[in-house]
């Protein structure tokens, strides 16, 4: 194993909680992740596609804390087995300040991860955010739509989530993002009550293109 990989795994062993099953000695899969991230970032391409790589939270933690990502404008982390823990790290990554497109489809991020993105000071340049199939309910969806930090967001994709599954009793304060013109809520669990609640809270106010198909 190269010295660079050795340093990388020393870092991974430091950040992984002691109660996890991650091996202390790297296997071929671990080496692939480290090499993949190093090679992908080293190209300098502003569009980084890491979809289907099964990085997990630990891989994203390594990416966010060990790599300079300031050249990125687009990042695709779909199908990577991410939870809210990985997203919390990503949302705090200072070198992602120039990111305008973030694709996180088919993970397990949930409402907690949505709140982390909504509260992020780093991701303020995001214009497109795709979150298809991520176990997101009304709380997480509305946190994004009313985020004071995501002031440039124009497209939000929440297809195949859990919006409408459980009716909220408390709604977030503030107004919907003024620049948000496209909202995809296709294939959720939205009924008349959810639509009425969202209308009353002002969530649809700036929307010009709304997809409510298959609800």
Regions found by a protein language model. Give the residues of each.
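Intrinsically disordered, low-complexity linker/propeptide segments enriched in Ser/Thr/Gly/Pro
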Residues: 22, 29-31, 36, 168-171, ...
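Ankyrin-repeat and related helical/solenoid repeat scaffolds used for protein-protein interactions
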Residues: 192-214
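The leucine-rich repeat
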Residues: 55-64, 82-91, 109-118, 136-143, ...
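LRR N-terminal entry segment and analogous cap-like coil->beta motifs
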Residues: 2-85, 105
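N-terminal cationic leader/targeting segments used for protein routing and processing
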Residues: 6, 14, 24-29, 101, ...
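Consensus "Asn ladder" position of solenoid repeat domains
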Residues: 53, 77-80, 104-107, 134, ...
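Leucine-rich repeat
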Residues: 16-19, 40-47, 68-74, 94-101, ...
């Amino acid at each position: 194993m190269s010295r660079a990989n050795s340093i990388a795994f020393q870092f991974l062993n430091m950040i992984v909680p002691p109660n996890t099953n991650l091996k202390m000695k790297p296997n071929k899969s671990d080496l692939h992740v480290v090499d993949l991230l190093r090679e992908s970032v080293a190209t300098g391409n502003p569009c980084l596609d890491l979809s289907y790589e099964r990085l997990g939270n630990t891989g994203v933690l390594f990416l966010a804390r060990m790599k300079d990502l300031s050249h990125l404008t687009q990042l695709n982390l779909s199908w990577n087995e991410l939870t809210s823990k990985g997203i919390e790290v990503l949302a705090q990554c200072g070198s992602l300040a120039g990111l305008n497109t973030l694709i996180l489809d088919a993970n397990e991020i949930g409402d907690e991860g949505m709140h982390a993105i909504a509260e992020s000071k780093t991701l303020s340049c995001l214009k497109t955010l795709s979150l298809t199939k991520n176990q997101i309910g009304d709380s997480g969806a509305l946190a994004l739509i009313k985020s004071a930090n995501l002031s440039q967001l124009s497209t939000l994709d929440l297809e195949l989530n859990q919006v409408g599954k459980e009716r909220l009793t408390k709604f977030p304060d503030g107004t919907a993002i003024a620049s948000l013109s496209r909202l995809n809520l296709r294939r959720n669990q939205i009924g008349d009550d959810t639509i009425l609640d969202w209308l009353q809270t002002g969530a649809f106010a700036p929307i010009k293109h709304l997809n409510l198909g298959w609800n």
